[in-house]
Curated annotation (Swiss-Prot):
Glycan attachment sites: S154
UniProt protein name: Fimbrial protein
NCBIfam families xref list: IV_pilin_GFxxxE
Propeptide: 1-6
Record flagged with keyword Transmembrane helix: yes
Effect of substituting S154A: Loss of glycosylation
Post-translational events: O-glycosylated; glycan consists of 5NbetaOHC47NFmPse(alpha2-4)Xyl(beta1-3)FucNAc in beta1-O linkage to Ser.
Organism of provenance: Pseudomonas aeruginosa
Annotated GO biological process: cell adhesion; protein secretion by the type II secretion system
Membrane topology category: Single-pass membrane protein
Cysteines paired by S-S bonds: C133-C151
PROSITE patterns per the UniProt record, alphabetical: PROKAR_NTER_METHYL
Key words of the record: Disulfide bond, Fimbrium, Glycoprotein, Membrane, Methylation, Transmembrane, Transmembrane helix
Length: 154
């Protein structure tokens, strides 16, 4: 008798079934991971502007996100993000009330995942110098674990 070479059909079917089960578990986990990572990155990009905002407040200048600020204004130095709606400096909406309160707002869009697209990140400063972060207007596919601990969904 000749020795068997190769695999039987049932062995191949078992391997395909195992790979299918592993993929069914891994793909949703990976999608959640990428969504969390994108939200965390966007929050970090917006939060990084707090230092520039503090400098503007100390100098008594109005905080703006503009390529051509006036002498009485301070550009926070934001560069374009692939995760936020809009283009260039307009991706960040700045509200400076000139009383020490500031609000930096960005909307997730562009290349961000569909589960997080449209969520709004707001980083705000009270006049006592305390900064807060919150995420609002989340899409229906949003999961609670997407928001980082330092910027909860409200």
């Amino acid at each position: 008798m000749k020795a068997q070479k190769g695999f039987t059909l049932i062995e191949l079917m078992i391997v395909v079934a195992i790979i299918g089960i592993l993929a069914a578990i891994a793909i949703p986990q990976y999608q959640d991971y990428t969504a969390r990572t994108q939200v965390t990155r966007a929050v970090s990009e917006v939060s990084a502007l707090k230092t520039a905002a503090e400098s503007a407040i100390l100098e008594g200048k109005e905080i703006v996100s503009s390529a051509t600020p006036k002498d009485t204004q301070y550009d926070i130095g934001f560069t374009e993000s692939t995760l936020l709606d809009g283009s260039g400096k307009s991706q960040i909406q700045v509200t400076d009330n000139q009383d020490g309160t500031v609000e930096l707002v960005a909307t997730l869009g562009k290349s961000s995942g569909s589960a997080i697209k449209g969520a709004v990140i707001t980083v705000s400063r009270k006049n006592d110098g305390v900064w807060n972060c919150k995420i609002t207007k989340t899409p229906t596919a949003w999961k609670p674990n997407y928001a980082p601990a330092n910027c909860p969904k409200s």
